[in-house]
């Protein structure tokens, strides 16, 4: 993951030193103008269509750095036509859908705005993925 420029997310409940280093790394990324790519579900489950509840980290960073969110959804599809000739037949093809930017309103209180960003992003991504019934809420908080 580090070779690809990834930074592991530390467990904030057990290692405050690691969390401090993590936040310092993102401050440096922001200073350099780098993009952040975060899976708000905290991990990715291949082939699982519903969107699980989102963690608040990506939305907190959007608010902290006053940067827009750009929702992206990865969906899978069966290999058909010419694509059946290339690659392992059991591996599906991927479709990446990019949504509309969501801008943080830093005039609002952080906690309320982070929750709004999470709700809007979750709803947009459910729609982008073509999910008609998603069994999961946008977050576990307040449930």
Predicted regions and their residues:
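Membrane-interfacial amphipathic helices and adjacent loop/beta segments
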Residues: 1-31
């Amino acid at each position: 993951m580090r070779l690809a420029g990834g930074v592991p997310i530390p467990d904030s409940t057990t290692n405050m030193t690691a969390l401090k280093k993590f936040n310092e790394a993102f401050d440096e990324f922001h200073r350099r103008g780098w993009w952040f790519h975060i899976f708000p579900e905290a991990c990715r489950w291949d082939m699982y269509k519903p969107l699980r509840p989102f963690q608040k980290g990506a939305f907190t960073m959007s608010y902290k750095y006053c940067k827009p969110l750009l929702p992206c959804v990865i969906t899978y599809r069966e290999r058909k036509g010419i694509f059946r000739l290339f690659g392992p037949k059991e591996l599906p093809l991927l479709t990446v859908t990019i949504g509309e930017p969501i801008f943080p309103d830093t005039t609002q209180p952080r906690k309320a705005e982070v929750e709004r960003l999470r709700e809007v992003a979750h709803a947009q991504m459910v729609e982008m993925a073509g999910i008609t019934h998603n069994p999961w809420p946008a977050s576990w908080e307040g449930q």
